[in-house]
């Protein structure tokens, strides 16, 4: 099955061979299968909370990616994202979460950081709404920004964030912004139109909430009102490899 724009962008953002990649995207295994092909030295872990879905993913993997050694390159789990057994698997980790709201994603990440306080791991995130809340949480965790960009699929616009959670509490070299920075640095007309539409959607959303008496929304509306869309040579802001 062909990947959509959003999953394709996620695959393209995995530019190094992690020892372990966790597909927590509620995507029927499509992303993880693409990463199995692209990163032959990585172990890909497929995670879903719904038993019937993970059973189907397991059968598909057995069919298309049969084990050739005693150590298969993929594993499947029926569990909550909060319960990922990161420390049971030595090496570098990338956790990919998409297809859920930024509020729920925030809960997942906070719990993962709490349960693995001495372990660095990367996160590749594509939330549905509530990105400001998610960014607040990532900033509180002292997350290191690697890249951020906008991607449009089926007339919906998503933020794609690649960050690293580090165990140290020292100064962060590339901290996140609450409203994004390189999201608004565009290199062509199409990107400019997407950025303008997305910014307008956010401004209108928080303006409506602020008019309803939401003090937090008033602050967010003002923050997005201050955003400027700028022309840039590179709109992905690849900071750290």
Residue map of PLM features:
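Conserved class I S-adenosyl-L-methionine
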Residues: 18-27
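Class I S-adenosyl-L-methionine
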Residues: 2-9, 84-85, 93-94, 103-241
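Local beta-strand N-terminus motif with an aromatic residue
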Residues: 18, 41, 92-93, 120
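Conserved SAM-binding motif I beta-strand of class I
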Residues: 43-48
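S-adenosyl-L-methionine
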Residues: 52-89
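Glycine-rich SAM-binding Motif I of class I
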Residues: 29, 33
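Short glycine-rich anion-binding loops that position phosphate/pyrophosphate groups of nucleotides
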Residues: 27, 100-103
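Gly/Ala-rich phosphate-binding loop of Rossmann-like dinucleotide-binding domains
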Residues: 36-37
């Amino acid at each position: 099955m062909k990947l959509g724009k959003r999953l394709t962008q996620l695959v393209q953002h995995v530019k190094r061979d992690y020892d372990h990649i966790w597909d927590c995207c509620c995507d029927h295994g499509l992303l993880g299968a693409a990463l199995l092909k692209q990163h032959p030295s990585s172990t890909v872990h497929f995670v879903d909370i719904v038993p019937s879905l993970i059973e189907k993913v397991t059968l598909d993997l057995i069919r298309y990616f049969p084990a050739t050694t005693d150590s298969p390159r993929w594993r499947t789990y029926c569990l909550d994202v909060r319960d990922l057994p990161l420390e049971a698997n030595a090496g570098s980790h990338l956790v990919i979460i998409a297809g859920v709201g930024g509020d729920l994603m925030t809960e997942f990440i906070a719990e993962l950081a709490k349960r693995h306080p001495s372990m660095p791991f990367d996160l590749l995130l594509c939330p549905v709404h509530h990105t400001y809340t998610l960014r607040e949480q990532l900033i509180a965790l002292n997350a290191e920004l690697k890249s951020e960009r906008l991607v449009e699929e089926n007339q919906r616009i998503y933020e794609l964030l690649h960050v690293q959670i580090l165990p140290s509490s020292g100064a962060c070299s590339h901290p996140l912004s609450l409203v994004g920075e390189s999201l608004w640095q565009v290199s062509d007309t199409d990107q400019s139109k997407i950025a303008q539409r997305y910014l307008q959607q956010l401004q209108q959303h928080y303006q409506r909430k602020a008019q309803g008496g939401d003090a937090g929304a008033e602050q967010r509306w003002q923050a997005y009102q201050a955003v400027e869309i700028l022309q840039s040579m590179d709109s992905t802001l690849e900071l750290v490899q």
